[in-house]
Amino acid sequence: MAQRQQLIECPPARVWDVLADGGTYAQWVVGTKEILHADNDWPAVGAGLRFRVGLGPLTFEDTCVVRICEPGSRLELEAKAEPFGTARIAFTLLPWADHTLVILDEHPLRGLGARIQGPPTELVLHLRNRHMLANLARTATKEAP
């Protein structure tokens, strides 16, 4: 299980605003090239995002669905990442003085990713998630009033 955390220098409400805006995900989610559609009720439980992911010229269209939403503090997604299967991606926001401690927990649930889970997979997820949290921090603080 790949768990990382980052202190973001803005209040939890600002970080939540970024998580709650499906249109921003291409700005900070590593590998996401473009958001194709965000359900109007995002991030309500059951709402989805359709997006294009890829590396270089190789791209795929994938989706994610909200599984748990506690506005302002917790968002859990199930992301489909073909051909690898699905993954659980959980964000927890904790107030930390005037800032936000974001805990990101990601692990494969189904498919090839779940079957090959081990140290190499964990390393890739840790590197990806470190970069993703840094992007989230930049997005949240850049847009802060």
Q: Which residues are covered by each model-predicted region?
A:
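Short, surface-exposed coil-to-beta transition loops
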Residues: 2-3, 59-63, 85-90
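A generic structural motif
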Residues: 30, 71-72, 84, 99
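Glycine-rich portal/gate segments that line the openings of hydrophobic small-molecule binding cavities
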Residues: 36-81, 96, 134-145
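Beta-strand/loop substructures that line and gate deep hydrophobic ligand-binding cavities in soluble
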Residues: 78-131
